[in-house]
């Protein structure tokens, strides 16, 4: 459900947050499977380390995610090419104006039934080659899954959509 944040919460001013994405789906025999949860939580920790967020216990997160999915298994669709999308995320919640790593964090998982990521399926997609804007630079945060990386891509995505392209290929200068 909704959460309450102080207007000075560090996430709102300094963007100290990371997220991951993974899927739970139903196998043909009805079993519920998670796709590479260990790898997702390891990648979450790579992002955490880069943004000075405490690391999570990968094994514990995988186990708790399995329990969470089992509790919400009725939300896992059974139609072809569907799944339950899981979005674990962590953000600095302490109210503080001034740049420093947070001291208090929320860790949550959102779950949502989804269809195919690309509605085109296996059909070819039109790719817009971005030459003006840069998404990542050597030594930067481009390898992390953090909101700022996606926010900075919105302008190029809007241009691509306006020109009827499906996705952006970043040349990064």
What are the language-model segments listed below?
Residues 75:
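Active-site phosphate-binding and catalytic loops of NTP-dependent enzymes
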Residues 1-64, 68, 96-173:
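Helix-start/capping segments and mature chain N-termini
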Residues 71, 79-101:
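Non-catalytic, conformational "gating/processing" segments within enzyme and secreted inhibitor domains
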């Amino acid at each position: 459900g909704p959460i309450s944040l102080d207007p000075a919460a560090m996430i709102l001013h300094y963007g100290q947050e990371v997220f991951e994405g993974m899927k739970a789906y139903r196998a043909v025999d009805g079993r519920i499977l998670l796709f590479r949860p260990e790898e997702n939580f390891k990648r979450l920790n790579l992002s955490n380390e880069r943004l000075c967020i405490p690391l999570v216990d990968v094994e514990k997160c995988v186990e708790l995610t399995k329990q969470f999915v089992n509790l919400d298994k009725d939300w896992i669709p059974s139609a072809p090419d569907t799944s339950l999308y899981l979005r674990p995320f962590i953000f600095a919640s302490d109210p503080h104006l001034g740049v420093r790593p947070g001291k208090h964090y929320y860790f949550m998982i959102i779950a949502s039934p989804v269809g195919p990521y690309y509605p085109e399926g296996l059909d070819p997609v039109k790719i817009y080659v971005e030459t003006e804007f840069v998404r990542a630079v050597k030594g930067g945060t481009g390898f992390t899954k953090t909101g700022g990386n996606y926010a900075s891509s919105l302008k190029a995505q809007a241009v691509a959509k306006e020109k009827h392209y499906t996705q952006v290929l970043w040349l990064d200068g």
